[in-house]
Amino acid sequence: MNHNTSFQQQLLQQLHQPGGSNPGGVGATGAGNNSPSYPEASLMGSKFWQKQMQLAQLSRQTGPTSHGYARAAAINSRQQHGRDGAQVDADKDQGPSQLTLVDLAVQTVQQDLVEQQQATAASTPQRGYTNQQKKDQLEEERQMTLMQQEKHQYWADLDMSGQGLMCLSPPLFRSYEFLLKLYINHNKLTTLPPAIRSLRQLRVLDVSSNMLTKLPPEIGMLHNLRYLFAFDNYLSTLPHQVGQLYQLEVIGLEGNPINQPIKEKLAQGGTKELVAELRESAPMPAAPKPREWIVLEEAGGRGGAATAAAATEGESGSTVATATAGANAAAAGASASSDTFTVMSYNTLCDKYTTVQMHGYTPLWALGWKHRSETLLKEVIGYDSDILCFQEVDGASFEDFWSPKLHQLGYAGLYHPKTRARTMSKEKDAKRVDGCAIFYKTKSFCLIEKLSLDFSSLALKNNDFKKTADTYNRVLNKDNIALIALLEHVTTGQKIIVTNTHLHWDPAFNDVKLIQVALLLDEVEKFAERVAKDSNRVSARNQDGNNVKYESGKKLPLVICGDFNSTTDSGVYSLFSQGTVTNHKDMSGRAYGKFTDEGMNHGFTLKSAYSNIGELAFTNYTPNFVDVIDYVWYSSNALSVRGLLGGIDPDYTSNMVGFPSVHYPSDHISLLAEFSFKKQKGGDGQPKKALDFGNSGSHSGSRKT
């Protein structure tokens, strides 16, 4: 028998059980609840509103029972396994199973999916769902979540239905953040506390048949919510924050005096269109406070960039002064001294990755490239950094947007796409592949040399890298890259190696990220040694001999920027900061020859610029991931950090599901650090005096690559 038919028969049978035939159900008798609404003729033909009526009727019929969901689960479990836990013979009639509101909602979503597939691919036969395929996807998600948690939580559903509850204590929500399903239907609740925002793992929320007059705005923070049942309350409208529930499949509103525009939108397009309408029509959120500029007094401060407002102690022991920064505070500080410069690292979020499926909490107009590019450019101009390291820049935006816009501002740029761009047969497709870009101010730096790196090629050529199954299955099939620029500081003659990279994203491949960094640092070391040996080299900008010599490559100023997709407890962070990694958990069970047998190391003295303040709260802000994965590494023996751009206003993020948002155009935030050169000996054993080239001919010695 077709499962859809049997499912409908079960529903009809259950609805006609005693107490189920009354169209008013519990809605008419439960304390304070509305009676069901009788839809206008204009709604009767809507399949979406018919499903609302069907779901609401089942809610009224099954809801009055105390702990109705828990009882249904127990009944269904006994039918499946028997009272003694033994598997029951499927051929024997065990009686009807207990259908819940969630079961019916999941079934309607699956039916809609099948209809959509049939409509878009009519020529492809579509098989009906088998019993195995119809397993509740919410339960599958629950099992996956439980397996991934370090502290195993063996239950994730809470049923408090039919208890006559008049209020809920906020600690309930803060203590049960792991909940996936919460049933508080058929009570006497008049409000939901704002603390409900804590339940960010929630997939199902049933608040039907209460006395709610409104839903709290904080409900918009429940970004994992799939099913929201609010039948038979006193809701006349919905907060616009419901528009942030981009994964919502079903919202139940029948039995509420809901306003006509919401009712019509739900009847015409269903839940998805209603959520989209609320998202797109939401008012502009309040602008965040400006990011603060943090002055590292240990390095001598930033001449007059800002007045210190407060002092705190960083993890490294250095005292930092915090001051509110204007849009161009970094540039103001850098210009105060001839031996300082600023570096920005920014994953700008490639346009092709901005999908509704990934970022459905953001209005479409704010997700579009026009708005994001304008906001990105405004931010870059405001901070006026001397060196820019961008990740996730596709070829088209580099050529058509970034290069011409930044050229007008006095920058020259370099670009290297990910390796898959070379496999594209069409130039248009190749230009959609993202990569890394480096821009530098030609009045501050001139380009000596550039080097492009492909990690898969480096692994293939490296003799210490054993060609194992892990090598072929995990490393060689990744297309991540790095870009290196050797720059010379115009006023001091100091050379600096600027490196920009974007490592593999998947947390299941932390070993690959560590290998990629080891390969990168090995290449940078070889590059630096070659530059040091050739330190008598004089650029077109320094014909009068303002040239600095370096005893070895490790003495060269070095900055490595990027999206490393690695947290501070990762092997990547350890290798950078400690100079060596052996037996790290990220490499557990992997075989990469000497890289795993003897560990990995480098000879630089590297430090994260933001480690001077204990790192930021986050650099990547998405619904299911908020952490630090972007860094600006520098050679602490050759450079000093003078200042850092602070984090995002926490009051702003407390109301944001994730980035990008109207005000922040990427899911990453920009990092900005001000450095000063430590003194290096010149050819005569003394530091050379900085040259003043003025404004004339400021572009003559640079070349754009």
Curated annotation (Swiss-Prot):
Positions of LRR repeats: 152-175, 178-199, 201-222, 224-245, 247-267
SUPFAM superfamilies listed in its UniProt record: DNase I-like (SSF56219), L domain-like (SSF52058)
Record: residues binding Mg(2+): E392
Biased composition (Gly residues): 21-30
The protein's required cofactors: Mg(2+)
Region spans: Disordered: 15-42, 75-94, 117-137, 679-705
Biased composition (Basic and acidic residues): 81-94
Pfam families, per the entry: Exo_endo_phos (PF03372), LRR_1 (PF00560)
Gene Ontology annotations for the cellular component aspect, listed alphabetically: CCR4-NOT core complex; Cdc73/Paf1 complex; P-body
MF terms in GO: 3'-5'-RNA exonuclease activity; metal ion binding; poly(A)-specific ribonuclease activity; RNA binding
Any one GO BP annotation for this protein: DNA replication checkpoint signaling
Reactions catalysed, as given in the entry: Exonucleolytic cleavage of poly(A) to 5'-AMP
InterPro entries: CCR4/nocturin_mRNA_transcr, Endo/exonu/phosph_ase_sf, Endo/exonuclease/phosphatase, Leu-rich_rpt, Leu-rich_rpt_typical-subtyp, LRR_dom_sf
Documented EC number(s): 3.1.13.4
PANTHER family recorded: CARBON CATABOLITE REPRESSOR PROTEIN 4 (PTHR12121), POLY(A)-SPECIFIC RIBONUCLEASE (PTHR12121:SF100)
Descriptive protein name: CCR4-Not complex 3'-5'-exoribonuclease subunit Ccr4
Source species of the chain: Yarrowia lipolytica (strain CLIB 122 / E 150)
